[in-house]
From Swiss-Prot:
Disulfide bonds: none annotated. InterPro entries: Thioredoxin-like_sf, UAS, UBA-like_sf, Ubiquitin-like_domsf, UBX_dom, UBX_domain-protein. It comes from Arabidopsis thaliana. Residues 335-415 form the UBX domain. SMART domains: UAS (SM00594). One of its GO terms (cellular component) is nucleus. Signal peptide: none annotated. Gene3D superfamilies: DNA helicase RuvA subunit, C-terminal domain, Glutaredoxin, Phosphatidylinositol 3-kinase Catalytic Subunit, Chain A, domain 1. This is Putative plant UBX domain-containing protein 14. PANTHER family: FAS-ASSOCIATED PROTEIN, PLANT UBX DOMAIN-CONTAINING PROTEIN 16-RELATED. Keywords: Ubl conjugation pathway. CDD domains: UAS (cd02958), UBA_TAP-C_like (cd14273), UBX (cd01767).
Amino acid sequence: METATRTHQQRKLISSFLDITVNQTVEIATQFLEATTWNLEDAINLFLIARRNPHHHHGEELVPLPLPSKKNTLYDYDPFMSHNTSVAVCPEEIWDDESTSEESDSRLSSLYRPPPSLFFHGSFEDAKATSSREDLWLLVNLQSTTEFASHLLNRDLWPHDAVFQAIKSSFILLQVYDDTSEGQKISTFYKIDSVPPVVLLIDPITGQKMRMWSGVIEPQGFLEDLMKYMDSGPHEHVASLTSNKRMKTEKISCSSNNADDQDMATFWGNAIEEEKTVIKSGKEETFTSDRVVAPSWGPEFEDIMTLSEHEEETCLSCDLLEFPVLTEEPKADCDRSVVCSICVRFPDGRRKQRKFLKSEPIQLLWSFCYSHMEESEKKEFKLVQAIPGASKTLDYGAKATFDQSGIANSMISVTWE
């Protein structure tokens, strides 16, 4: 059984090695992994060093095969069982390498190193306490050093501009590995059966798992899912649950008092019947209390009504505003370096996403929002950018581009004036 497990682990490491190095053979992958006692990171770095070595003769293989390592130990060493350690592994250390003097940005491994400033550095309990104290949702990323999808998450999801900003503003992100005691505790407690990578959204106050993603996660879909939790923090969520329970209790209490209310209604009905009188107007016209006599409000009330109508016209004056014509959205094959993506959240909860050229004026964002409003909603509105620790109201009169204004690849909320 133990031999079968080891063989399965080795096959996964070989597969990951081939995915990263590209166009290499199983034999080369096996030799490099064996030379580094089946350590994927060391094997890849050794492969890169060997490939860059200029001292090879014409006709020889481009990648020289490494010599197998030899070690003398006092006891049998099992590389797969030795990963059971209580020491947490920092995510940025997985791809760190001090075995070569080459610049980190020239190594293939630098592509798979996640942004260290995005992650919480500490234990799961510390992350939960900090999230609760700062009223932020807790995201837990369970990774695996042997699953290539985990490295893809570090390369494609966490460095994504919009995802990075969303997490910084409303979440705390903890990354742990499944071969540590911390990762195993989380897997057991939340009954995670999926193969890493797995991302959990946790209420830090109650510890409840609110949402889970697994496998290769696309940034756009992940961002849309996160935005559902950015309108309110965990404290407001718990307060709403408490409020719902209180409302149910009040309904039960109200139903028990219905009989008393009916008795009071009967009492007042009888009293009204007894006090029916004949009302005579100046023209001697007769009315009874069964008929409602409309009061005369006088000119003062008419002035107030006129003022209210004027205010309503002012609120709807946005209909007269002319926004610039919305340009055509950049195509998918457009150069990504000149394109930005904006996600807009409307007051009714709808979310729309659109791409703009970074060189285009930000006034087009008002045009985009206005085009997605119903006729009954078209009134004065403002656009607010959610940034960590504060919010920024955008200025329509500012003559700036998306790139100059700093709102490229961000989330914008529409609020009524």
